[in-house]
Structures are given as structure tokens and as C-alpha cells.
């Protein structure tokens, strides 16, 4: 199974990169995981939030793997349990889907991009820093995979 995470933003703290790498390597051969950073649009002098999101949308759309099952992370999305995420993962795996998760920029993402998503998901009702979202998403995807393999990582 292929999972791609597109995350607007670059230059994350080292602990973010290390944590994402740690969970990504735990997937093993069953999951090909890739995190791709999308350059954020600079705000200020003549570039407002809407213009910035539009520029980021263009970069995101160019980076989405062709035919991918698109999942966007948004505060208005549904917050699945770890077991529900595992069920999604199982379905995607059975259908041979290449799943692409999108983490928007500081101002979020355009409505047009959200409408293209097959699922809108949120990790928490709390506002989280972007680096933390990368880590939490990767950990939860690993947890979902471990649930499917009856690995003791997840405990009810």
C-alpha cells in the first residue's frame, strides 16, 4: 500500500523529522510511506491569506499522485478513532488505493481543494502546530496498520 502525506511547510524542527522517520520505518514492507513538503506561499506585502492558499493549492494539486484517494486534514472534518482509521486503511489496502493525506498551510486550504477530497478528517478538536500534526498523523497511520496486523502496539 502507498501512503503519501503532503504537508505545506518546510524547515521543521529536528524532533519532528526524527519522529516522523521513526514511525515511517516501523511500517515495514507493507506500506510505502512518503512525506513531501510543499513550499508555503509567503504572506505580507500584497499577498493575503486567500491568495496564499490559492498558490499553495496549485502546488498541492501538482504533487498529488495521479489517481490517489485524497484525504484532507481540516478542523471541520470527522475525527475517527484509531480503530476506525484502521478500518479505512484496510479498505484502502483491499482496493489497492494510493492514499494521499494533505496537511494545509498556516491559513488552511481552499474550499475547492477540500471539495476534491474523498474524506475530510481531523486529528483533534485542539489547534495543533503543523509539525505535531505530521508526527500525530504518521503515528496514527502506524497504529492503524498495527491494529490490522494484531500487533501489541495498540491496546484497547
UniProtKB/Swiss-Prot annotation:
GO terms for cellular component: cytoplasm. Keywords: Cytoplasm, Methyltransferase, rRNA processing, S-adenosyl-L-methionine, Transferase. S-adenosyl-L-methionine binds at residues 73, 104, 123-128. It is an enzyme of class 2 (transferase). Its EC number is 2.1.1.177. It comes from the Bacteria. Homodimer. Specifically methylates the pseudouridine at position 1915 (m3Psi1915) in 23S rRNA. This is Ribosomal RNA large subunit methyltransferase H. The lineage of its organism: Bacteria, Pseudomonadati, Pseudomonadota, Betaproteobacteria, Neisseriales. The gene is rlmH.
Amino acid at each position: 500500500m502507498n501512503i503519501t502525506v503532503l504537508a505545506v511547510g518546510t524547515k521543521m524542527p529536528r524532533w519532528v523529522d526524527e519522529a516522523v522517520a521513526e514511525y515511517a520505518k516501523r511500517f515495514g514492507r507493507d506500506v510505502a510511506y512518503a512525506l513531501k513538503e510543499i513550499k508555503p506561499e509567503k504572506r505580507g506585502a500584497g499577498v493575503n491569506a486567500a491568495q496564499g492558499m490559492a498558490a499553495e493549492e496549485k502546488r498541492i494539486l501538482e504533487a498529488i499522485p495521479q489517481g490517489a484517494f485524497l484525504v484532507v486534514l481540516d478542523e471541520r472534518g470527522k475525527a475517527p478513532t484509531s480503530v476506525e482509521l484502521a478500518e479505512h486503511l484496510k479498505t484502502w489496502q483491499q482496493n489497492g488505493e494510493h492514499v494521499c493525506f494533505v496537511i494545509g498551510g498556516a491559513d488552511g486550504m481552499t474550499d475547492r481543494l477540500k471539495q476534491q477530497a474523498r474524506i475530510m478528517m481531523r486529528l483533534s478538536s485542539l489547534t495543533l502546530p503543523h509539525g505535531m500534526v505530521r508526527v500525530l498523523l504518521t503515528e496514527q497511520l502506524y497504529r492503524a496498520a498495527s491494529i490490522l496486523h494484531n500487533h501489541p502496539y495498540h491496546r484497547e
